[in-house]
Amino acid sequence: MTNIRKTHPLIKIINHSFIDLPAPSNISAWWNFGSLLGICLIIQILTGLFLAMHYTSDTMTAFSSVTHICRDVNYGWLIRYMHANGASMFFICLFLHVGRGLYYGSYTYFETWNIGVILLFAVMATAFMGYVLPWGQMSFWGATVITNLLSAIPYIGTTLVEWIWGGFSVDKATLTRFFAFHFILPFIITALVMVHLLFLHETGSNNPSGLISDSDKIPFHPYYTIKDILGILLLILVLMILVLFSPDLLGDPDNYTPANPLNTPPHIKPEWYFLFAYAILRSIPNKLGGVLALVLSILILMLFPILHMSKQRSMMFRPLSQCMFWILVADLFTLTWIGGQPVEYPFIIIGQLASILYFMIILLILPTISLFENKLLKW
């Protein structure tokens, strides 16, 4: 009798994806973040589902319902903080996953890469709408500021913003629709993840050397299942340390004040994972220019397959490109820091320089260095 795992139509799909999948023998811990993102998504959907059972999406009761979850629901505080800090873990894994892709040239699988960028946008949209739901001061003003950016679109801007708001300001209609979208998007993300994996399994995984590894493959199970379980345990350990010891470490104290349209907080800033993009947005004095730079700061990832000039795929054997890559990482840390600072000297100029450097490294310096390294190969 043939093994059911190889014949059953449904189990066969799981078998080809997670059990008998041929994987390169040399993929490092940087390849763990895909599975960690999957776990993050599952944690977020489950905790989010239980939160939605007790949450009310009405301006009068939203803040109180979150308080009720934390005070009165059994382990509600745990579910709420796992969801809030789970988002932070999600973004840490996302940034590391994207960084791995950039470093090792995984973007040459361009269908997989482009769906990944769309996924990044979808997760960012979901996180933004989720941040609005507790209806604290930073929720309200964050929603007001970010949705208002769309008014920079010529001709249709103002109409578009009022259409999204469902009125002339962020109010009940806005909160209700944000809750609806925040609920549905993770399931759309799950579908996109399946497409992401479908395209990845068409080509097989990349590996640190960037070379074709068809001649040296090992089965995914047990080697990488065990490796992934180790990663998952570490992820859960870090998440639970965050949740149980300092759940508010990454949050904003302003969000413990109920939303008040008559009182603007002195410093409006998003969650830490959006600060780099927020810094780029604020670096440009023009509204439309800022919005374009904000969108392009993420959309630029789609240009990497076109901008790849090197004869080698991975940066493993390209020390000059490695150097520029780590300068880019340092630049992103700088932008994240600036995004959380008030708009005053010297932060404005630092932010502007860091923003220029960000686009210059990606569009100009990395491709130029790659061409130079190609010349070095001939020495």
Curated annotation (Swiss-Prot):
* Primary location group: mitochondrion
Residues recorded as binding heme b b562, renumbered to this chain, are 83, 182
Q: Which cofactor does it need?
A: heme b
Database matches in CDD domains: cytochrome_b_C, Cytochrome_b_N
| Binding sites annotated in the UniProt record for a ubiquinone | 201
Sorted keywords for this record are: Electron transport, Heme, Iron, Membrane, Metal-binding, Mitochondrion, Mitochondrion inner membrane, Respiratory chain, Transmembrane, Transmembrane helix, Transport, Ubiquinone
Question: How is the protein disposed in the membrane?
Answer: Multi-pass membrane protein
Any single Gene Ontology cellular-component annotation: respiratory chain complex III
Q: Name one GO molecular function term.
A: ubiquinol-cytochrome-c reductase activity
Tell me if Metal-binding is a UniProt keyword of this record: yes
Subcellular location per the Swiss-Prot or TrEMBL entry: Mitochondrion inner membrane
Gene3D superfamilies per the record?
A: Cytochrome Bc1 Complex, Chain C
Q: Which residues bind heme b b566?
A: 97, 196
Q: Which residue ranges does UniProt annotate as crossing the membrane?
A: 33-53, 77-98, 113-133, 178-198, 226-246, 288-308, 320-340, 347-367
* Pfam short name (any one): Cytochrome_B
Note how many cofactor molecules are bound and how. Answer: Binds 2 heme b groups non-covalently.
Disulfide bonds, paired cysteine numbers: none
**GO biological process annotation, one example:** mitochondrial electron transport, ubiquinol to cytochrome c
Q: Which domain of life is it from?
A: Eukaryota
Q: What family does this belong to?
A: Belongs to the cytochrome b family.
Q: Other comments?
A: Heme 1 (or BL or b562) is low-potential and absorbs at about 562 nm, and heme 2 (or BH or b566) is high-potential and absorbs at about 566 nm.
Outline the subunit composition.
The cytochrome bc1 complex contains 11 subunits: 3 respiratory subunits (MT-CYB, CYC1 and UQCRFS1), 2 core proteins (UQCRC1 and UQCRC2) and 6 low-molecular weight proteins (UQCRH/QCR6, UQCRB/QCR7, UQCRQ/QCR8, UQCR10/QCR9, UQCR11/QCR10 and a cleavage product of UQCRFS1). This cytochrome bc1 complex then forms a dimer.
As for what it does, the entry says: Component of the ubiquinol-cytochrome c reductase complex (complex III or cytochrome b-c1 complex) that is part of the mitochondrial respiratory chain. The b-c1 complex mediates electron transfer from ubiquinol to cytochrome c. Contributes to the generation of a proton gradient across the mitochondrial membrane that is then used for ATP synthesis.
Provide the protein name.
Answer: Cytochrome b
Q: Which organism is it from?
A: Neotamias cinereicollis (Gray-collared chipmunk)
